[in-house]
A protein has these predicted regions:
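Signature of the first transmembrane helix
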Residues: 1-49, 80-88, 115, 211-236, ...
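Helix-loop junctions and terminal segments of transmembrane helices
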Residues: 14, 44-60, 131, 249-291, ...
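Membrane-interface junctions at transmembrane-helix termini in multi-pass inner-membrane proteins
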Residues: 118-144, 333-364, 404-406
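Hydrophobic alpha-helical transmembrane segments
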Residues: 140-155, 160-190, 250, 363-368, ...
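Interhelical loop/hinge segments that connect adjacent transmembrane helices in multipass membrane
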Residues: 160, 164-170, 182-227, 270-285, ...
Length: 498
């Protein structure tokens, strides 16, 4: 399901958006969506996290969970009202910041409010379904449904059925429809009551919830801002057109982290249980294993992207415009590798008795990112914004992992990451040799340049991938990977005999 959504998003972004939208319009849609995600994330007041924590205290099928789901709807509404008021109070400074280089965003800035509202309740009702162990349908709506509707919106705009105003309205309605579908599904379960029971909430529970919520709000102020700093700094300082070019580059780099979600989702419950049982030795082994496989997956995907980056941009409509951000792809991909490989350390900290330190490290990350963006964007443009992200995350993880290593005695690093890095560097050197001395002969064989590039890419990629897999296997980097290869070879051998 996740990969189906990625495929739809890939087609939409690379072949529809880049062909039919100007770079400024691409930047506009990115800033609108990111601003809406930020507002919705803050307005939730940490409900999605606190719902997971406190639902067991309310869970009672006979009493329809004592109105828990009513609280889960009311609290975000309060948060939305508060942050919408703040939005209007700071509207003028926000508009002044964007007006010089991103005036088009200022024209559509008020659409952030309805889009954020729909996004907020989309997540609220998905969380409610997850609490009832109903995960598939809400995830399908978010991962596939929204992307399909977004594709339809862009096609309507491409064929001039709707204008720019209509496209922005339709994008808002996309999230609205998804939210309504989640509500319908939740009610179809016939287990939900939104009638609040204030008398059921004990004094202790109320106090604990308030304190925990304040912690989540403080954390979310920083953590929700981080993913969107680049978008806001690039659009505000360099304009929506540059932000649009940067958006495509970031999307390409984000392919690196596709395996991260699945691996992280599988590992978190085990880390949580290990920390609860104080099995630090087992947690340390698990963390090293998770970090290694995240690193292997992300760096090999990055390798495949980077050796084919010129072909990728040549296939994208208007690729000669978007390839200005080629260096951004490189830097952001490295950021993604760092984040996917080392985020398991942050997971350990969040499940430990020192969880409150995560707020401190997140604040450090935010401040570093802001300072670096302000410093580097005037010097290097969108590449400066990418470097700001890289420096910020390196500082963040260096401090966080030192703390986790000293206080919790957990360390995600091993020599196997170093060996993997050496293998990938060797593959890059081999690819450089192939491109210098062999690719030109392949390209000369074809009159059509694109066909020649594709054939060359397929041959080089296949050859290098086989060398990479063989090297990982031969040096016994991962027992799990070796087991998969052995089973595959055994299957082929048996099949051949038959």
């Amino acid at each position: 399901m996740n990969y189906l959504g990625v495929l739809v998003g890939f087609i939409t972004t690379f072949f529809i958006v880049t062909k039919y939208l100007t770079t400024e319009e691409v930047g506009l849609t990115r800033v609108l969506v990111d601003a809406s995600i930020l507002l919705s994330g803050l307005a939730q007041l940490g409900t999605n996290t606190s719902a997971m924590r406190y639902y067991p205290y309310f869970k009672d099928e006979k009493e329809r969970d004592h109105g828990f789901f009513g609280w889960s709807v009311l609290i975000p509404l309060v948060g939305f009202v508060i942050f919408t008021i703040l939005f209007f109070l700071f509207r003028q400074p926000i508009e002044n910041y964007f007006s010089k280089n991103s005036a088009l965003f200022v024209d559509y800035i008020y659409f952030v409010i309805p889009m954020a509202f729909f996004m907020m309740y989309l997540m609220v009702f998905e969380t409610n379904s997850n609490l009832l162990l109903r995960i598939v349908i809400p995830k399908f709506i978010r991962e596939v449904g929204i992307r399909l509707m977004t594709l339809l919106v862009y096609l309507l705009y491409a064929f001039k059925v709707i204008g720019l105003d209509g496209m922005v309205v339709a994008l808002c309605l996309t999230y609205g429809i998804a939210t309504v579908l989640n509500i319908i599904y939740l009610f179809s379960l016939k287990k939900v009551s939104f009638r609040i029971q204030p008398a059921y909430v004990s004094k202790w529970l109320r106090k604990d919830f308030v304190l925990y919520t304040f912690f989540l709000i403080a954390t979310s102020l920083a953590s929700n801002l981080i993913p969107f700093l680049n978008t806001f700094f690039v659009s505000g300082k360099l304009g929506l057109a540059v932000a649009g070019i940067n958006t495509i580059a970031v999307y390409i780099a984000s392919i690196v982290e596709i395996p991260y979600r699945s691996l992280a989702a599988i590992s978190r419950p085990h880390i949580s249980q290990g920390m609860k049982d104080n099995n630090i030795g087992d947690v340390n082994k698990l963390v090293k294993n998770v970090s290694l496989h995240q690193f292997m997956a992300s760096i090999f995907i990055f390798f495949l992207i980077w050796i084919n980056i010129d072909l990728l941009y040549s296939l994208i409509p208007n690729g000669n415009v978007y390839d200005e951000a080629k260096l951004v792809v490189l830097i952001i991909a490295v950021v993604k590798i760092v984040n996917t490989s080392l985020n398991v350390g942050a997971t350990v900290l969040s499940y430990s008795k020192y969880y409150y330190y995560s707020l401190l490290f997140t604040i450090i990350l935010t401040i570093t990112a802001i300072v670096m963006n302000i410093t580097l964007i005037p010097m290097w443009g969108m590449e400066g914004a990418a470097m700001a992200s890289l420096i910020s995350y390196v500082v963040y993880y260096a401090l966080l992992l030192m703390f986790v290593n000293v206080r919790i005695k957990v360390n995600p690093f091993s020599l196997k990451e170093f060996y993997t890095l050496l293998i990938v560097i060797s593959l890059f050197l081999i690819d450089d040799f192939l491109q210098r001395y062999l690719s030109q002969y392949i390209l000369e064989m074809f009159d059509n340049k694109i066909i020649g590039q594709i054939i060359d890419s397929v041959l080089r990629t296949s050859f290098l991938l086989m060398i990479g897999i063989f090297s990982i296997y031969k040096f016994n980097i991962s027992k799990q990977v070796n087991d998969i290869i052995n089973k595959f070879v055994s299957f082929l051998t048996r099949h051949k005999k038959i």
